[in-house]
Amino acid sequence: MIEKLEYWFSKCSDCLLHPEYTKLLDELYNYELNQEIIDFLCDKATSKKHWCEIRFEHLKILLLNETSFNYDLKQFYFDSLKRCRRLWLKMFYIRGYAFYATEDELLPVMKKFQQQLEKNHDYIDYEYILSEAGLPYLAEKYNYTYLKETLETAKKEYQKIDPLLRGYFTMNEKLEHINLISNEEALKRSKEFLEKHKI
């Protein structure tokens, strides 16, 4: 499997996965992962050469394939979330870290994340963060008070975003992107937003 992964990944671009490579990634969701594949996925999930969306396709397997939790990835997730600048992607590194971390270890990570939520109002970040796979998942699974507080902060800050930029998409429990409005409606809202703000 690793040879196939490496070969077809070499056929991918920085922003687009080759169809054959995508098929291999799909197989990995139900594949018993070994150390070699874990290392491969970790490397690709943090590659600065590729777009966030490409990194996320590899991270999703680590988060959803339960055999990945047979390996100690605590330091990988911690290092990754510290380096990650994109808030929505950081959210999912935190999700991985939470599996290994104690309540006390996760607290400072979430406090800093909460502060970042109060500074950042990129609507794309919030759609991912507030999806059922994001903060709501963490708050329900671990039931820590500070996770619930962070979720409330995210909801409050989301309301500060222009309504024309909210509600375009979400993510389900399988970390799949779900469009909430049609392309026509998205284009209409975008035009209204540009006119409203004279951009």
Task: Identify the residue ranges that each predicted region occupies.
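Amphipathic alpha-helical scaffolding segments comprising HEAT/armadillo-like alpha-solenoid repeats
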Residues: 1-10, 32-44, 67-80, 103-115, ...
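Extended, charge-rich alpha-helical scaffold/interaction domains
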Residues: 2, 12-16, 179
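Short, aromatic- and cysteine-enriched interfacial helices/patches
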Residues: 2-5, 133, 169, 197-199
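Solenoid-like repeat scaffolds
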Residues: 7-15, 43-51, 79-87, 113-123, ...
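Structural detector for internal amphipathic alpha-helices that build alpha-solenoid repeat scaffolds
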Residues: 18-32, 53-68, 88-101, 123-141, ...
